[in-house]
């Protein structure tokens, strides 16, 4: 038979456990989005922002700034969408070097990065996979600056070269805060660098969802990829994997250790 003192202790412990369990069950699913700011990514971002925040809470966004868009216009576009949706509380980080000044001057290598196999543990340099997008399309997509300028309400947040939070800092901060799911809808560079550098934080990653690759392709013409260059040169490559295949390899390999 338990003594009154021990009984009180047991009841107290059970009460604390029940309180913590209720807190966990009632907590929203925390989400971090890693994007290359392609046009379809805007729709994905808007969808996440429309979800009930008490159930699904987007807490951070990181940009994988490659040849598809550049860091300055991409970050500003994201900022304006967040402002329009009333979510200026969301931190935005960018992987890549360079910048755009307030007067529109484009600094060298804006938003580019070396594929992970060439860059070591940094995110600086030029992208060697520009063959995946013809030059004309790059310039057309960079004109998303004009889209945001004419169609989106603009808040006060702006991309500032050398002061913008890095993608790695945002990922580390958000994963360190507690359990989180990571959505990757661009190249895998940012996530691969994080997973390789911060194995001690893997226990906080609940799920990783990626948009990339092709499985059991049944195209009768043999074209299973989606590159913008001539399909016959690489009929199987998928854009998000192709832009940094070694990073994708690292993500898939390290997933087994989560």
Swiss-Prot record:
Record's subcellular location: Secreted, Extracellular space, Apoplast
Keyword Secreted: yes
Source organism superkingdom: Eukaryota
The EC number(s) this enzyme carries: 3.2.2.-
Sugar-bearing residue positions: 52
Primary location group: secreted
TM stretches of this protein: none
Keywords assigned by UniProt, alphabetized: Apoplast, Glycoprotein, Hydrolase, Secreted, Signal
Pfam families: IU_nuc_hydro
One Gene Ontology term, aspect cellular component: apoplast
Example of a GO MF term: hydrolase activity, hydrolyzing N-glycosyl compounds
Keyword Glycoprotein carried by entry: yes
Record family assignment: Belongs to the IUNH family.
Task of the protein: May be involved in the degradation of extracellular nucleosides.
Protein name stated in the entry: Nucleoside hydrolase 5
């Amino acid at each position: 038979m338990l003594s009154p003192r021990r009984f009180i202790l047991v009841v107290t412990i059970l009460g604390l456990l029940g309180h913590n369990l209720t807190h966990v069950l009632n907590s929203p699913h925390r989400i971090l989005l890693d994007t290359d700011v392609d046009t379809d990514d805007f729709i994905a971002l808007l969808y996440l922002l429309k979800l009930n925040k008490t159930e699904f809470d987007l807490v951070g966004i990181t940009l994988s700034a490659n040849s598809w868009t550049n860091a300055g216009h991409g970050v500003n576009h994201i900022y304006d969408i967040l402002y329009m949706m009333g979510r200026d509380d969301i931190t935005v980080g960018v992987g890549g070097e360079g910048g755009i000044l307030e007067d529109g001057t484009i600094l060298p290598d804006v938003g580019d990065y070396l594929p992970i196999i060439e860059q070591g543990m940094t995110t600086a340099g030029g992208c060697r996979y520009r063959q995946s997008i013809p030059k004309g399309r790059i310039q057309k997509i960079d004109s998303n600056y004009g889209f945001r300028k004419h169609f989106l309400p603009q808040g006060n947040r702006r991309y500032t070269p050398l002061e913008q939070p890095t993608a790695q800092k945002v990922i580390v901060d958000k994963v360190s805060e507690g359990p989180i799911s990571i959505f990757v809808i661009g190249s895998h560079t940012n996530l691969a660098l994080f997973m390789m550098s911060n194995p001690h934080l893997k226990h906080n990653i609940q799920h990783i969802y990626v948009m990339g690759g092709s499985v059991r392709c049944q195209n009768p013409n043999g074209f299973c990829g989606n590159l913008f260059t001539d399909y016959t040169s690489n009929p199987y490559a998928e854009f998000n994997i192709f832009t940094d295949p070694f990073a994708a390899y690292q993500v898939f390999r390290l997933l087994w250790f989560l």
